[in-house]
Amino acid sequence: MDDEETAEVEVEANPLDPIDDAIQDDLSPLDPPSSDMSLESPGSEDDSDLEALPRWMIPQNRLRSAVDMMVSQARTQNGGIAALLNRDNFLQRVRSMVFSQERRRSRTSDDTSQDGGEQAEEPPQPIPRTPIDIDMEEGVRFDTNLPAEHSYFGNHLSRVPGVDYLEHILFPGEVLPFMIDGSLFDDEMPGLDGLIFGVGFPLMQPPEDNPHKLYGVTCQVYEKGESGRQLVFYKSRALQRIVINCDDIQGPPQYIARNPTSKCFSKVKILPEYFLPEPLKCVDMGSMSRFRDIPSMRDKYRRYQLSSTPWPADACQEYAYEEIVERARKKLEIHKIDTMPRCPIQLSFWLVRNLHLTEKMMRLTFLTDSVNTRLQLIGSTLKEESLFYCRYCNSSLAYCSDLFAMSKHGVQTQYCNPEGYIHETNTVYRVMSHAIGYSGEPSTKFSWFPGYQWHIILCKFCAQHVGWEFKAVEPNLAPKVFFGLAGSSVRIGKASESTPVNGSSFVVRNMLRLISNEME
């Protein structure tokens, strides 16, 4: 898809600067504080005596409260924080907000003293979110097999032979589409074997005991097609986790990243996948084993098993994963996902992709070689309510409970835009009100979802690209509208985080620092 982010970082590719740069650029043309920005300047008739205080005597908590209020108000307006800083007399408006809040506190204090016997009002409860049921929408249900085929590459893809025996998923189980110069692979792709290559994760911090390790996955190409621009479309599937010793790499990886027409080679170590079956399933109860699969006798049978083993019940429960799988199944029923694998190894990686863990938890599940431990880590997150936050300003964008599968591969899928940039996309029914704005015009060109047009969406608070809105252009197609959040622009966080929904402590801190410098 054609948006601000491309594989080659160019100036015109991302016209929206990060929030720190936007703040500095917007404030740079401001002149030094003039008399109308001074706290000693005459105020209106309603101004309190606080306005006559020197600027350095304004309490920091009052200043922060005023800035937080202005930031919250800016989020619901067009232009977000950038528009707030572009207005004239910014510091004067900050000072006026301080005085306005002080007068409001004074009036509230007087009202409270007069009505001291009355009980304080309870804070308003959040408005419950109305659940969305896509089955209630009229029209033809979208075929989730279409996005998995990546048909936006065209219809002239040829199957690469020799990879059918690797159709099973090892890690992460995702199809990785990409578009590069065909000369990189064609010379080394035998006629009967699909090319296997490695994809490294340089941003994944290795363990402290060996900082020279690079983790990644092996991938195998299984389809390719011509683009007509001396580029070749490839589809590959991730297979296994690997670790590379950076000292063994033949060719500097940093140079390869900047020059994609070059290659590097290295020996890799395939990381093992250890799985221990549940201990009680290994206990032979003789003739009583026939009661194992009878629901009414299952609990009693389990108690007999525990009494006949030297292991405590907690030790047996540590390796039990069926309960975790059942809890995950119930949670994913909301997302209309019914393609859960049966193999525990495949299942552990599949759950990581579809349950949307935090970045820290993703790293832990990737680095562990024990499937049982991986499933236990996943099970510890099932009760948590998670949100999508803007990676640039920490503003809340959407609830993870609104995720749903528009592809047979799940709620999170890799897609490639016309410039070759690969986007990790999370599909959700809706985003929070006043959370997004739009950029450019909608288009159906190179659409990842046939029958839908895409429209670039921005975080309304910091004006950074966070994904796309997809709207049906074919009649009777359901869902009518949904959103795709770009994995590079959002992060997963707990709903219990202290980050305010209508503001950002990160932006507030930066504004306070700039205001402090201007007012000294």
From Swiss-Prot:
The UniProt record lists the Lon N-terminal domain at 157-386
Q: Which Gene3D superfamilies match?
A: 1.20.58.1480, Peptide methionine sulfoxide reductase (2.170.150.20)
User: What positions does the entry give for Zn(2+) binding?
Assistant: 390, 393, 459, 462
Task: List the molecular function annotations (GO) for this entry.
Answer: metal ion binding
Xref: InterPro entries: CULT (IPR034750), Lon_prtase_N (IPR003111), Yippee/Mis18/Cereblon (IPR004910)
> Which superkingdom, per the lineage?
Eukaryota
> CULT domain: from which residue to which, for each copy?
385-494
The record's subcellular location field reads: Nucleus
Q: Which ranges are annotated Acidic residues under compositional bias?
A: 1-11
User: Which intervals carry biased composition (Basic and acidic residues)?
Assistant: 101-110
Q: Name one Pfam family in it.
A: Yippee-Mis18
The Gene Ontology biological process terms listed for this entry are: positive regulation of neuromuscular synaptic transmission; positive regulation of Wnt signaling pathway; protein ubiquitination
Q: Where is the composition biased (Low complexity)?
A: 25-42
Please outline how this chain is modified post-translation: Ubiquitinated.
Map out region (Disordered) in residue numbers: 1-52, 100-133
Name the keywords, alphabetized: Metal-binding, Nucleus, Ubl conjugation, Ubl conjugation pathway, Zinc
Give the UniProt entry's GO cellular component terms: nucleus
Question: Which pathway does this chain act in?
Answer: Protein modification; protein ubiquitination
What is stated as this protein's family in its record? Belongs to the CRBN family.
Assembly state and interactors? Answer: Likely a component of a DCX (DDB1-CUL4-X-box) protein ligase complex. May interact with pic/DDB1.
Q: What does this protein do?
A: Substrate recognition component of a DCX (DDB1-CUL4-X-box) E3 protein ligase complex that mediates the ubiquitination and subsequent proteasomal degradation of target proteins. Has an essential role in mediating growth by negatively regulating insulin signaling. It also has a role in maintaining presynaptic function in the neuromuscular junction synapses of third-instar larvae.
Protein name in UniProt? Protein cereblon
